[in-house]
Amino acid sequence: MTELPPNAPNPENATNELAQELLRKLRQKQGNWVEWGQAIASLQKSGYNPQDIFEATGFEPVQQNQVIVGSQVYNSLEKSGASAATLAHYATRGSDVLYELRLLTHEERAAAGDLTFTHKVDADEAREIAKAIKDFSRFRILPEGFSNHPGDAVAYQAWKLARQYSDLQERSRLIARGLRFAHSETARKQIEQLLVDFTVVSQRPAPIPPFFRFDTEDELPRIVPVVGQLPLKAEELKAVPLVEEIEPFRLVKFSGEQAWVALPGWQVLLAAEDPVTILATSDRFPKQNQTEPGPVLVVVDRSQREWNDFSYFVVDHDGELDFQWFETKPEFPILGKVIILVRPRRILDENVTKDSWQIDE
């Protein structure tokens, strides 16, 4: 009799047990906020979405993002040589402050972390410090009198802004800020010079950013997977994965080989739960005042499999997909409902449209 080996541990069970343990620790607020951020990041990588984690632990999605990013910044502080006092301070508080340092490099984060700890700043001031350091890092040659220390970067920002103000109150506030953060003596002297030099240096205003907004649903397209060109088999229709959109821009993530098409946000398409598209020709459907058959994009909602007598459906006909209308309920399964037939854009004369002057006339 063959002796069976002991049951090997199931990786899926082990992963699920670990996830449940992390959820329990988060629910009971065990550990510090850095560990919470690492636990939430691990859960999200395992497939838990922020809403699931919120319902299981009470951590709101915004808070989840803050502690995840903050814990990553804290790790940068550890690896890049932040002081022990800084690390000890931020291990128990300040996720909102470290979150604001996320756009800096690892080395800049460590230096900025020490600076924010030394000056006991809040999140709003940390955001300004991060911006000052980021802007200062773009200089190939350092401004006269200022070193590459993050304190001098903040001092330079204050010095530059103070020179643009004629209002003495605002100018004095910025000078005080610069003196507070200045690290080098030369930077301090540059700022102190503003106490006797009241010259105002005007700055060219930044251009208006090219913001656009989607005003209607039609303007925001829906990305739909393409099954392929007929003839196709039922298995090919079923093999296309269900698409999950990420709001607010309907972002679609996918790994692997898959064709996609962007369609306008028509209401019937927005209402579809599981739409896919199939490339076909119009002669597969009854003629609708058309002289020549042409290509069409058939949009099918795989979630709608209930028969009615006023719709077309996709079915498996002798091993291949087909589109049919049924006067009575069919005896075989329905694979989806045809919700839209899209014809290509009509171009009257392609040669004419290449020359805009001909169209204008």
Swiss-Prot record:
Source species of the chain: Nostoc sp. (strain PCC 7120 / SAG 25.82 / UTEX 2576)
Higher taxonomy: Bacteria, Bacillati, Cyanobacteriota, Cyanophyceae, Nostocales
Renumbered residue ranges of the record's region N-terminal alpha-helix: 16-197
Keywords, ordered alphabetically: Carbon dioxide fixation, Chaperone, Cytoplasm, Photosynthesis
Name of the protein in question: RuBisCO accumulation factor 1
Function recorded in the entry: A major RuBisCO chaperone. Acts after GroEL-GroES chaperonin to fold and/or assemble the large subunit of RuBisCO (ccbL, rbcL). Cooperates with RbcX in RbcL folding, plays the major role in assembly of dimers into RbcL(8)-Raf1(8) intermediate complexes. RbcS replaces Raf1, leading to holoenzyme formation.
Alphabetical list of Pfam families matching this protein: Raf1_HTH, Raf1_N, RuBisCo_chap_C
Span list, region C-terminal beta-sheet: 221-347
GO terms under cellular component: cytoplasm
GO terms of biological process kind: carbon fixation; photosynthesis; ribulose bisphosphate carboxylase complex assembly
Family label: Belongs to the RAF family.
Lineage: superkingdom: Bacteria
Coiled coil ranges: none
Entry remark concerning the domains of this protein: Has 3 domains, the N-terminal alpha-helical domain, an extended flexible linker and the C-terminal beta-sheet domain. The 2 C-terminal beta-sheet domains are swapped and pack against each other to form the dimer interface.
Subunit structure: Homodimer. Forms an RbcL(8)-Raf1(8) complex. Each Raf1 dimer clamps the exterior of an RbcL dimer, protecting it. The extreme C-terminus (residues 354-361) inserts into the catalytic pocket of RbcL where the Glu-361 forms a salt bridge with 'Lys-202'. This insertion probably contributes to the assembly of RbcL(8). Forms complexes of many stoichiometries with RbcL with and without RbcS. RbcX and Raf1 can bind simultaneously to RbcL.
InterPro entries: RAF1 (IPR037494), Raf1_C (IPR040858), Raf1_cyn (IPR046382), Raf1_HTH (IPR040781), Raf1_N (IPR041358)
Localization: Cytoplasm
Cysteine disulfide links: none
